[in-house]
Swiss-Prot record:
<dbReference type="InterPro" id="IPR003593">
    <property type="entry name" value="AAA+_ATPase"/>
</dbReference>
<feature type="region of interest" description="Large ATPase domain (RuvB-L)">
    <location>
        <begin position="1"/>
        <end position="180"/>
    </location>
</feature>
<dbReference type="GO" id="GO:0000400">
    <property type="term" value="F:four-way junction DNA binding"/>
</dbReference>
<dbReference type="InterPro" id="IPR008823">
    <property type="entry name" value="RuvB_C"/>
</dbReference>
<feature type="binding site">
    <location>
        <position position="20"/>
    </location>
    <ligand>
        <name>ATP</name>
    </ligand>
</feature>
<feature type="binding site">
    <location>
        <position position="19"/>
    </location>
    <ligand>
        <name>ATP</name>
    </ligand>
</feature>
<dbReference type="GO" id="GO:0006310">
    <property type="term" value="P:DNA recombination"/>
</dbReference>
<dbReference type="InterPro" id="IPR008824">
    <property type="entry name" value="RuvB-like_N"/>
</dbReference>
<feature type="region of interest" description="Head domain (RuvB-H)">
    <location>
        <begin position="254"/>
        <end position="337"/>
    </location>
</feature>
<keyword id="KW-0234">DNA repair</keyword>
<feature type="binding site">
    <location>
        <position position="66"/>
    </location>
    <ligand>
        <name>ATP</name>
    </ligand>
</feature>
<keyword id="KW-0067">ATP-binding</keyword>
<keyword id="KW-0227">DNA damage</keyword>
<feature type="binding site">
    <location>
        <begin position="127"/>
        <end position="129"/>
    </location>
    <ligand>
        <name>ATP</name>
    </ligand>
</feature>
<feature type="binding site">
    <location>
        <position position="309"/>
    </location>
    <ligand>
        <name>DNA</name>
    </ligand>
</feature>
<feature type="binding site">
    <location>
        <position position="180"/>
    </location>
    <ligand>
        <name>ATP</name>
    </ligand>
</feature>
<comment type="function">
    <text>The RuvA-RuvB-RuvC complex processes Holliday junction (HJ) DNA during genetic recombination and DNA repair, while the RuvA-RuvB complex plays an important role in the rescue of blocked DNA replication forks via replication fork reversal (RFR). RuvA specifically binds to HJ cruciform DNA, conferring on it an open structure. The RuvB hexamer acts as an ATP-dependent pump, pulling dsDNA into and through the RuvAB complex. RuvB forms 2 homohexamers on either side of HJ DNA bound by 1 or 2 RuvA tetramers; 4 subunits per hexamer contact DNA at a time.</text>
</comment>
């Protein structure tokens, strides 16, 4: 079952192609990353050069794919999109690279999942725009260098720490994407509603924004579900009251937590005394993959002060206790003697 407020991609998000801005000037939020990219793009265009390689990292659903497409549009070049798990063999990458034209953008999503063997092929391609091809086997094998057109690699990852140092060091532009503010999300929601022909009140847009976990992908997904509710059970206009009723039906609370978020926090509080408790233990207790908890759920809980990550494990904060109407335990007092 697809988690409604998961920031992972789903079939429903194919509709987002029509919502994505095509220019940096239309892109909402991420002002620091947007400003830097705009400067570097203008400089590259002024010199008629390919843009330096770009690494975009941050939690899922914040606009990394959108920015990659905007880079290609702003540079006036084509974009070839793929993902790390799809490129299984060096030959797969070689086929992609040899089909690029001058200054094209190659977008690799989940670039941290590239195999070490594939990375070795990517190093000279990024640095020297050359492809090393081995012909033959054994002692008679020889390597020839194939020149590649100068291109821009845009890599996206939710786990920048898993990138090897040699790969990370070859990116000239590294930008971290942050969670969006409520005001930015309300603007995005209003724009999406206009594109879809929906009627939405400013208060309704802000209510959706507050519960979208700082993530545009979640905001657009919630907007489509609330639209269904407004169409069937209201007059078609998404007001604050309609949004509140629809989200209550979907079991999404005031903080944007769904059943999985509540399960994580309540497991730590009720079963493990508030923590610390290991990630694998939490995953086993709620029947979820530990990587999914770490990549998808934890960033929002940590940044909003509901969860602490310590060397001994995860700890529920006083804010988490208050959210569920519980009294946080007193911190242990150290003894002087």
């Amino acid at each position: 079952m697809t988690r409604l407020i998961s920031a992972d991609k789903s079939e429903d998000d194919l509709l987002e192609a029509s919502l994505r801005p095509r220019a940096l000037s239309d892109y909402v939020g991420q002002e620091k990353a947007k400003g830097n990219l705009g400067l570097f793009i203008d400089a590259a265009r002024g010199r008629s050069e390919a843009l330096d390689h770009v690494l975009l990292y941050g939690p899922p659903g914040l606009g990394k794919t959108t920015l990659a497409n905007i880079i290609a549009c702003e540079m006036g070049v084509n974009i070839k999109s793929t993902s790390g798990p799809v490129i299984e063999r060096p030959g797969d990458l070689a086929a992609i690279l040899t089909n690029l034209e001058a200054h094209d953008v190659l977008f690799i999503d989940e670039i941290h999942r590239l195999s070490h063997v594939v990375e070795e092929i990517l190093y000279p391609a990024m640095e020297d725009f050359q492809l090393d091809i081995i012909i033959g086997q054994g002692p008679s094998a020889r390597t020839i260098k194939l020149d590649l057109p100068k291109f821009t690699l845009v890599g996206a990852t939710t786990r920048a720490g898993l990138l090897s140092s040699p790969l990370r060091d070859r990116f000239g532009v590294i930008s971290r994407l942050e969670f969006y503010t409520h005001e930015e999300l309300a603007f995005i929601i209003t724009r999406s509603a206009r594109i879809f022909g929906m009627a939405i009140a400013p208060e309704g847009a802000m209510e959706l924004a507050r519960r979208s976990r700082g993530t545009p992908r979640i905001a657009n997904r919630l907007l489509r579900r609330v639209r269904d509710f407004a169409q069937v059970r209201a007059d078609g206009v998404i007001t604050r009251e309609v949004a509140d009723q629809a989200l209550a039906l979907l079991e999404i609370d005031d903080m944007g937590f769904d059943m999985m978020d509540r399960a994580i926090l309540l497991t730590i509080i009720d079963k493990f005394g508030g923590g610390p408790v290991g990630l694998d233990t939490i995953a086993a207790a709620i029947s979820e993959e530990s990587d999914t908890i770490e990549d998808v759920y934890e960033p929002f809980l940590i940044q909003n002060g509901f969860l602490n990550r310590t060397p001994r494990g995860r700890v529920a904060t006083a804010a988490a206790y208050r959210h569920f109407g519980r009294i946080a335990p007193e911190p242990p007092q150290g003894k002087l003697f």
